Amino acid sequence: SRGLGDVYKRQMVDSYIEQGFKYFDTAYPYHNGRSEETVGRCLVQRYARDRFLLASKMPVWLVKEYADYEKYFEEQLKKCQVEYFDFYLLHAMNKDRVKEAENLGGFQFLQSMKAEGKIRHIGFSFHDKADVLDEILTNHPEMEFVQLQINYYDWESENVQSRKCYEVAEKHGVPVIVMEPVKGGTLANMVGEPARILSALDENASYASYAVRYAASLPNVILVLSGMSDLKQLQDNTAYMKDFQPLTDKEQQAIGKVVEELEKLPTIPCTNCRYCVEGCPKKIRIPDIFGVYNMGVQFGLTDVTRGSYRCQIDGSGKAGDCIKCGKCEAQCPQHLEIRKLLEEAADIYEKEMHL
């Protein structure tokens, strides 16, 4: 996690492994390109190779020719200090990226690395509609797993299509690894009626626990990824997943009611993937601004949310700086109307705060 020293990161790794967990997920761009090196220092140097499973991903948007696959892959092995990846993915595939990967030989590259023993299991992470996923899995039966955005809020969403994508994978007999089970942290922070509904089930259970268990309860899910920023989150996650219990009927019904309540709130369904940030000519930290926007919707315009907004625009562009070029919208896996939403954020915060 950004800003944490290696000593703390090692504590998190140790706590996780001591409790019997072993899967670590990284990728080329995570944490400004430093995540894989951190994995090398804090995990790989300190544990025998059979103590952990390591996944990383090919940054397909950087690939211009077949040789680039080799270049980035070798760089990733070196950064992580491993001779092979247990799981390796083509990163953030959608309709356009899959065509590029097919034209440049991305799928063949994964198969060749598997044949050489440098990858144990090949797959891809996916951000698009279910019909695109169906086409990919039909054309590429060699794919052993798919990583999908699944959470109870997006299950019936026409934007994300969690359920439809899950059912496509199930139809093809391809196991699912879940990402975004807590929807970028959104489902870990409940107030009002949603908070009351979940607290009534068990006042000691975290809101995040219901979201992660929801995803883990699906039969074709082999693994649920959950981003953990500190030891407290890690200890909470590992406590309820060590002795995993699928959701009961009562819990499923409660989650249904929570979704009904959440849908009444006009929050922005941003997952903080940050693909929109890279090409922004005004250096606007779009997901961070949307995060504060959502805080305002959920908790009101308070000193905390105002302070958070000031913090997010410190040293970078504010929402009102947007020139509406649309580069961000072309990158957004959630297909959000970012330009319009930035205008709304500027209206709420910048006018009120005279920025």
Placement of each model-derived feature along the sequence:
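Alpha-helix-loop-beta-strand connector modules within alpha/beta enzyme cores
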Residues: 37-56, 109-112, 116, 171
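Structured C-terminal cap/extension of enzyme domains
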Residues: 12-22, 41, 164-355
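Glycine/proline-rich, positively charged
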Residues: 14, 18, 61-182, 189-196, ...
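Glycine-rich, proline-tolerant flexible connector loops at the mouths of alpha/beta enzymes
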Residues: 23-43, 94-98
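Short catalytic-loop micro-motif centered on adjacent basic/acidic residues
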Residues: 23-30, 120-124, 147, 223-225
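Short, small-residue-biased leader/transition segments that mark boundaries at the very start
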Residues: 1-8
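Hydrophobic residues in well-ordered beta-strands that form the structural core
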Residues: 25-26, 56, 178
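Structural motif corresponding to the early beta-alpha repeats
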Residues: 30, 46-67, 91
